[in-house]
Amino acid sequence: MKIHEYQAKEVLRKYGVVTPRGIPCFSVDEAVKAAEELGGKIWVVKAQIHAGGRGKGGGVKLGKSLDEVRTLAGQILGMQLVTHQTGPEGQKVRRLLIEEGADIKKEYYVAALTDRATQKVAMMASSEGGMDIEEVAHNTPEKIIKVFVDPLAGLTDAQAIELAKGIGVPEASIPQAVDTFKKLYTCYMETDASLAEINPLILEGNGNIKALDAKFNFDSNALFRHPEIVAYRDLDEEDADEIEASKFDLAYISLDGNIGCLVNGAGLAMATMDTIKLFGAEPANFLDVGGGATTEKVTEAFKIMLKNPKVKGILVNIFGGIMKCDTIATGVVAAAKEVNLSVPLVVRMKGTNEDLGKKILAESGLPIISADTMAEAATKIVAEVK
């Protein structure tokens, strides 16, 4: 689960991390009022969407008068903001953050994250703040410092000092940086985040350290422990089909291809998508029905896939372990009839009650194409949609 920047800063402030003063707004008048309340001579008008690259996309502007704040807020609020993370369709800006200006002397990057390659908790920092960290990792990997943290010991002073010195924090500001790093790590652990990122972390002209921007990703499986985090959820920022799928315990992610995929098990689902790509087509979605799929779940899965106008065919790939093939077959037949399926459907199933499942499909009277292997299934569905 993702949250907005202003919400991320609220979370950080609860742990003692210093951020600029800011006020979230939902209208132009609120934006002007917020600037008046904050005072000063310069304000930052920031679009709030669940995507990075907002500045490059025109979603972050400086206002040097209240009239300018009003103009900028009017331009940004309601715009379809396109960044490298939103895709070409962009995301609509429905809320703003009006923030006091900052005297930026230097920008850094710091994050606490789950390092999948090593299966460890890591603290990562760079002297190249304010940039896309993936870009830095690709072009100048030597400018990224990473330390691995023992969860039982936590981030030690020595590790935090190593990070601060490694990214060039001035000696006088190292104690503040160390304090910020340790608070960020504690926040990351206690909120069950998979990523807690400050980018940029700034050094001000007076030597103070502040979190100028922040981003969190939270482990959705741990949200039951954090109702205060769940309260931050903004459904407007999420895919409507993904929200609908979650109501039926379906793991669904929309993609850009034209072949719908319905699979049981995340690993098999990813292998299925890879196989589709291998045979020259693109998957339209990731969809894992899990090990306890019912006829209702399968029907809803079909409905969700077919909402996407780009879907020209569907591939069902089932391994019958916990899930019985005849159960899936019954669900597939019922779903195809209920939605009046009009696109090609290829079904490949192996495992428990496989023969019974194939019999149900064969006797359904529907034009369902059977396959025995993943390669055969992919070949057939790709041929059907071309």
Swiss-Prot record:
Keywords: ATP-binding, Ligase, Magnesium, Metal-binding, Nucleotide-binding, Tricarboxylic acid cycle. The gene is sucC. It is an enzyme of class 6 (ligase). InterPro entries: ATP-grasp (IPR011761), ATP-grasp_succ-CoA_synth-type (IPR013650), ATP_grasp_subdomain_1 (IPR013815), Succ-CoA_synthase_bsu_CS (IPR017866), SUCC_ACL_C (IPR005811), Succ_CoA_ligase-like_bsu (IPR005809), Succinyl-CoA_synth-like (IPR016102). Succinyl-CoA synthetase functions in the citric acid cycle (TCA), coupling the hydrolysis of succinyl-CoA to the synthesis of either ATP or GTP and thus represents the only step of substrate-level phosphorylation in the TCA. The beta subunit provides nucleotide specificity of the enzyme and binds the substrate succinate, while the binding sites for coenzyme A and phosphate are found in the alpha subunit. Mg(2+) binds at residues 199, 213. GO terms for molecular function: ATP binding; magnesium ion binding; succinate-CoA ligase (ADP-forming) activity; succinate-CoA ligase (GDP-forming) activity. Substrate binds at residues 264, 321-323. Binds 1 Mg(2+) ion per subunit. It comes from the Bacteria. Belongs to the succinate/malate CoA ligase beta subunit family. Its EC number is 6.2.1.5. This is Succinate--CoA ligase [ADP-forming] subunit beta. Residues 9-244 form the ATP-grasp domain. Its cofactor is Mg(2+). PROSITE patterns: ATP_GRASP, SUCCINYL_COA_LIG_3. It catalyses: succinate + ATP + CoA = succinyl-CoA + ADP + phosphate; GTP + succinate + CoA = succinyl-CoA + GDP + phosphate.
